[in-house]
Amino acid sequence: MTTSPQEQAPDRPPARGAAQSQGHPRRWLILGVICLAQLTVLLDNTVLNVAIPSLTRAMDASTADIQWMINAYSLVQSGLLLTAGNAADRYGRKRMLIVGLVLFGVGSLVAGLAESPGRLIAARAGMGVGGALLLTTTLAVVMQIFTHEEQPRAIGIWAAVNSLGFAAGPLVGGFLLNHYWWGAVFLVNLPVVALAVAAVAAYVPESGNRLGERPDLVGAVLSTIGMASLVYAIISGPEHGWTSARVAASAASAVLVLGAFAYWERRIPHPMLDLDFFRNRRFTASVGGLVLITFGMGGALFLLTQYLQFVLGYGPLEAGLRTAPMALTVVALNFTGVAAKWSARMGSPRSIGLGMALMAAGLVSIATLTEHGYTGTLLGLVLIGAGTAVGSPVMSHAIMSSIPREKAGAGAGINGTLNEFGAGLGVAVLGAVLNARFAALVPVVASSLPAALAAAGSERERARITGAYSSGLETSLLVGAVAVLLGGLIAAALLHRADRGDRADGEDRADRGESGGRT
């Protein structure tokens, strides 16, 4: 099979050479194709939440069954992101993209026709395998087909599709459930998957590293177990308590296994994850910034969704609609190219600083303007969305451009893992702050807000409980704002330092070249 000029490009970003001077001639069409594949996966992340009441009635499912229906997907997907990215680099990104779509489609078919909770849980796990392949290969293909100058905008559109899927999931699910039975939320994926497979086969170019390196099977197993244990601890924390034996054991297992993974990756000649990436100043700064952006966004949405449902009394669908402005702001700024233009004018360090400052301002707005009703929340969501639109694509591009092109799949796996980790960390940390504040104000029945409200003997007691929860929400969001702002300043400073170092290195190379030419 012949390779295109884009596939023969050097390892490093084109800013350092002549690679990728021209993008793939059909790159924008290909971006639309891979975004269609991406949207299929992301819709499924939130669409199931709306179907929970119907599933509970139809299958007589227990609370544990429902939790596993939701969590099986995210556990498998999160655990396999690094492995999926490595597989895409090794066996071809187009091939793995098609495999991911097929697995996701088969899982959707089995889920839609499932007659028992166990079968549905297994199908959701299978969909998670396909989802991991899709999330990593799509970003790797974006880096392959676009020029260095176009990559930030392309990544912005790719990220906007992520937000669109998150916002549209409850709407699509609600529409389908109003007209069809619960299986429709899964079977609707099938025509989209079929269209995406045909389009990928026709338009997406193949790429990958076919150097014959031995697969890192031990690393794949360790990373999968470690990340799944970490995500399980984060998922279980809000329900079972962060100090419970279940959560502590899962977290301890994650630390031990991921430590063993890092040790193993250092010892072998062809690691799944090259830890030398973390010596790159730009890569390290972007990693920290991306974790903090998803920390603020994930934690805020988790807390705000509970506040809207338990305190203000909105149903799941309406609560989802009221948080949608954040995602829609991301979509608007990235699809129109406004965020990319701002970033190009300001440069990466300032873009990240501005993005994190906007996010922090949004968290403060939600925390302090609750007495103004939904207006303060809406302002905060728009600010968080604007900050995410400006900062997140810049950091994703910085991560991906710091990694050799032959390892783009691994870079996409790192990017996806950081998103999952940051969001989970936000839920864990900000949730713990809220619970501590809530327990201090309502010590008798502070195990959970629903339990406290159910045990309330009067309207006055209910008002005291909701007031305590609001106070806890304010405290946790302010803590998140401080963390995001400080993290943004540090990430911007580190990126600025990395830029200065790159310029100095370039000047040194130029000076040596001139000196060599004169001798």
Question: Language model features by range: what are they?
Answer:
Residues 21-23, 149, 195-224, 266-284, ...:
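Flexible interhelical linker loops that connect adjacent transmembrane helices
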Residues 151, 190-208, 224-235, 253-268, ...:
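C-terminal membrane-cytosol helix-exit motif in multi-pass small-molecule transporters
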Residues 178-190, 236-247, 315, 436-481:
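A membrane-interface helix-boundary motif in multi-pass transporters
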